[in-house]
Amino acid sequence: MKRFIIIFAVFTFAGSAFIKAQDVSQLTAQCAANAGDVMYLKDFVVKLDQGTPGGAPPTARFALLLSKNVVYRFSICSAPNSDGEAVLQLFDMNTLLGSTFITATGKDYPFFDFKCQKTGVYHVFISFKEGKAGEGVGIMSYVKKL
């Protein structure tokens, strides 16, 4: 009987991990499909806790190498169970180059295109509005060569 309970617990835990992985892959596939007629290159999966009041919102940071004279598309999707809306920002050092949320207008966009002018390391930051908790995925896609 004890062995049966242990085996049942192991299968239950393994099954929940498989379902979670399946949800992330479905969200990634859906987000990549929403990017349009582009070539998928990379995904950025995030799960962030809620931020503290008055503090900086939790942010995931990813470094990537982009090539000169290439147009990239950066897309963002939030999981349905997320409290917050995901925002993707692209930086070169401290310079904001693109964002899926325009603070001045309060408008969200599902993606933005970036025309890379120089080969180098860039950083993708993903956070959730108002520091809320959430899960999401960012997608980097190839659009065309200039």
Regions found by a protein language model. Give the residues of each.
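Extracellular/mature segments of secreted proteins
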Residues: 38-42, 124-126
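Sec-dependent N-terminal signal peptides
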Residues: 4-15
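N-terminal first-folded block
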Residues: 44-46
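Intrinsically disordered, low-complexity, compositionally biased regions/tails
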Residues: 19, 140-142
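Predominantly extracellular/luminal regions of secreted and cell-surface proteins
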Residues: 19-40
